[in-house]
Structure formats: C-alpha cells, structure tokens
A protein has these predicted regions:
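Short, small-residue-biased leader/transition segments that mark boundaries at the very start
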Residues: 1-6
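Hydrophobic cores of alpha-helical transmembrane segments in multi-pass inner/ER membrane proteins
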Residues: 8-15, 68-81, 140-152, 176-180, ...
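Short, hydrophobic transmembrane alpha-helix segments
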Residues: 16-28, 53-59
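Short aromatic-rich membrane-water interface segments that cap or initiate transmembrane helices
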Residues: 57-69, 126-139
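Transmembrane alpha-helical segments and their boundary/interface "anchor" motifs
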Residues: 66-67, 91-113, 135, 171, ...
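Hydrophobic alpha-helical transmembrane segments in multi-pass integral membrane proteins
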Residues: 107-115, 176-191
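Membrane-helix boundary/juxtamembrane motif in polytopic membrane proteins
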Residues: 157-175
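Extracellular/periplasmic helix-loop-helix junctions in multi-pass membrane proteins
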Residues: 185-203
Length: 217
C-alpha cells in the first residue's frame, strides 16, 4: 500500500545515511557519479516497456524524485533539530554531500517529467492546466536555486567564497524548501480532490513534513 511507499523511501535513505555516511564523506565523487549513472539509466529506461511492478516500485521512486526529495528532507531537518542531538552530529558532517547527491537524483526527475511539461510550457502553455502551468514555472525556479546551491556546496567552490556571502546564499534554501512544498501540493491536490487515496496521503504526509519543519524553524 501507500504507507509502504513512504516506508520504503524512508528506509532506503535512512539505511544509506546510517551505513554509508563515512564512505560518502571520504569518497563523495564516487557517490555523485553513482547517482548520475542511476539518474541517466532511469531516464533512459522510462522509454522502454517495463513490467508495471518495476516501473512503479523501482524506477518510479527515482523518476518521481522521491528518493532525492527524502534526502533533501533529511538535509532540511538537520538544520532544524537541536544542535546537540545525537541524530544530528553524523548528519551535519555529510550535509553538503547529501544535498549534492539529492540534487543529482532530483535532476533525473526534472528531465523525465520536463520532457513533457517544459516542452508544453514553452511551446503550448495553453495545453497545461493552471496548476500544471504554475507547477512547471515553480519547477524552473527550483532547478535554478538547486543548481546554485549544489555548485556552492562543493568544497572547492565554497572555499573560494567569503563565509558571509556563502551563508547568505545558503539562506535561499528556505525559499527552495517552501517552493518545493508548493510544487508538491500543486501536483497532488487536484488528484486528491478527486478522492484518490495515494494523492490524499501525499498531501497529508508532505504537509506534516514541511509544515513541521517550518514550525521547528
């Protein structure tokens, strides 16, 4: 069921962080390449006939940006939880690497869906509903912010920037999280209003996650 989808994402990301945090810090480049390879493979496989189970359960969690989003949520909460907590210490160390990995995986989602929606946005915007149009525009803003934040998360780039400038730039992450929530809602609410269980659960779960974060900030 749907609860299992979220459990699966959470379990995958939690296990990834728990077992690979040291390795991610030491060999970040390998993980970035791995994430890029997965992204490209998922993108290409989307065009091939696949058993529904594989399409929904394996490719889907990458194509829909779910794993990347779950990683961003981990990064997001790292900044919101109390500094001294045991949970945070290991996460703080890999925050940059985790957000870069998440960004690479989310770009896979942007390409997979972008082929349809961005094409329509630029060629035939009237074919999109008002919510789809807004979601597509927000998506473009999100991609720009994400690329800027990702590039400046690389240590080599970060070292070249003034600490104050870098900190100010990182604050745009709040805009990113806010727009990400709006984007997710715009995609899910129209279907949720039709009474589709999966989309109703999306609205509820993402609202708890994002509004809970806002309350903690």
């Amino acid at each position: 069921g749907l609860g299992d989808v979220y459990k699966r994402q959470l379990i995958i990301v939690s296990l990834f962080i728990y077992f690979l945090k040291g390795s991610l810090k030491k060999h970040a480049g390998i993980y970035y390449i791995g994430a890029a390879v997965i992204s490209i493979a998922v993108f290409l496989l989307e065009f091939l006939p696949m058993p529904l189970f594989v399409k929904n359960n394996i490719l889907g969690i990458f194509a829909k940006g779910s794993i990347g989003t779950a990683m961003f949520v981990a990064v997001m909460y790292t900044g919101a939880l109390p500094k001294g907590s045991k949970l945070i210490a290991p996460l703080m160390k890999i925050r940059g690497e985790l957000s870069i990995t998440a960004a690479i995986l989310v770009l896979c989602h942007n390409f997979t869906y972008g082929i349809t929606y961005f094409k329509m946005l630029f060629i035939k915007p009237e074919a999109l509903s008002a919510t789809q149009l807004t979601a597509a525009i927000i998506s473009l803003v999100l991609i720009i912010i994400m690329i800027v934040l990702t590039v400046t998360s690389f240590q080599a780039v970060r070292k070249k920037m003034q600490a104050k400038k870098w900190k100010q730039l990182q604050r745009t992450a709040y805009v990113f999280y806010g727009l990400m929530y709006v984007h997710i809602m715009l995609i899910n609410i129209p279907y949720a209003r039709l009474g589709l269980g999966m989309y109703i659960a999306n609205v509820v779960i993402y609202s708890i996650v994002f509004l809970g974060y806002a309350a903690m900030r």
